[in-house]
């Protein structure tokens, strides 16, 4: 992809073998977010861009075959980590808005393509710092006022919302258990700025942030009762956050609880007791 993107951008590589070293060698390296740093490193190495223009920057991004820079997951936590080290960030234009939330003083470059970045560092087309964006929910939450009767159950829901308690509803089909649970987010307090950042960082790692805009609504997750342990607590071949993490600062609704696998339910014990999810994987 790096070679094809450079060729499409009119930035041909020299006619000789080029070796790219990713250090430290003992750490596993996978994913498309290495495309952009490799390409920019090559451009600096052969003199296509000033060799010092990358100093003090963390770089993430995927390359298209036409030289465009595509979005990658995890840009927001990468930006926060880079800012903590005093670095700037070079990332895809589609991710610039979420990266801008890391710090108002942080230097962020979000080019659309390799050519646009080359024009920026040579002074031909200076890039503006991306502005942070907020995505307001397009639909209204189900309202607790819609529920008629069930005063005791509604009171329990209010107590759980006020104190951040877990809640178990038991009753016959049609009693309104699911309807009440789906209305819990409507009585929860708004996300604080710190909570909003936490929720958005998890969404960024999971690749569910839309247009780089932060989420301003508490998450509501309702996995099917056939969900696996990896889907619930996270993991998989390429480890990703599970439903427990995706519902952080929000609601994890397990409808038809007895239908869930006993192993899946038992996997929730540690997160409930410690307040964190730890995934151990070989290699």
What kind of feature is each model-predicted range?
Residues 168-212, 269, 274:
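Walker A/P-loop
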Residues 88, 165, 248-251, 274-277:
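Loop/turn-to-beta-strand initiation segments
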Residues 125-159, 163, 191-244:
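P-loop NTPase nucleotide-binding/switch module
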Residues 1-168, 172-179, 280-281:
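Peripheral, non-AAA+ core regions of ATP-driven protein-machinery
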Residues 46-48, 123, 207, 249, ...:
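Short glycine-centered helix-capping/turn motifs at secondary-structure transition points
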Residues 240-273:
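Conserved AAA+/SF3 P-loop NTPase catalytic/coupling segment centered on the Walker-B
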Residues 168-172, 237-244, 257, 274-283:
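Conserved Walker
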């Amino acid at each position: 992809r790096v070679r094809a993107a450079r060729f499409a951008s009119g930035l041909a590589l020299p006619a000789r073998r080029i070796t790219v070293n990713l250090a430290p060698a003992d750490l596993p390296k996978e994913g498309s977010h290495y495309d952009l740093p490799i390409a920019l490193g090559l451009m600096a190495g052969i003199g296509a861009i000033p060799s010092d223009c990358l100093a003090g920057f963390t770089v993430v991004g995927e390359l298209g075959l036409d030289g465009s820079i595509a979005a990658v997951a995890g840009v927001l936590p990468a930006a926060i980590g880079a800012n903590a080290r005093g670095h700037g960030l070079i990332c895809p234009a589609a991710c610039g808005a979420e990266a801008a939330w890391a710090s108002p003083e942080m230097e962020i470059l979000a080019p659309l393509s390799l050519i646009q970045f080359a024009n920026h560092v040579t002074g031909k087309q200076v890039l503006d710092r991306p502005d942070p964006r907020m995505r307001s929910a397009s639909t209204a939450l189900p309202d607790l006022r819609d529920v008629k009767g069930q005063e005791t159950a509604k009171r329990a829901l209010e107590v759980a919302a006020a104190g951040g308690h877990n809640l178990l509803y038991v009753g016959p089909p049609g009693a309104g258990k699911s309807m009440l649970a789906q209305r819990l987010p409507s009585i929860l307090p708004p996300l604080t700025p710190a909570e909003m950042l936490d929720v958005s960082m998890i969404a960024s790692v999971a690749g569910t942030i839309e247009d780089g805009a932060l989420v301003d609504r508490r998450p509501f997750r309702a996995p099917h009762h056939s969900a696996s342990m990896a889907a619930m607590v996270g993991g998989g071949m390429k480890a990703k956050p599970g439903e427990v993490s995706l519902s952080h600062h929000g609601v994890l609704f397990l409808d038809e609880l007895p239908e869930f696998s006993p192993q899946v339910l038992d996997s929730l014990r540690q997160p409930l007791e410690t307040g964190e999810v730890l995934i151990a994987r070989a290699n």
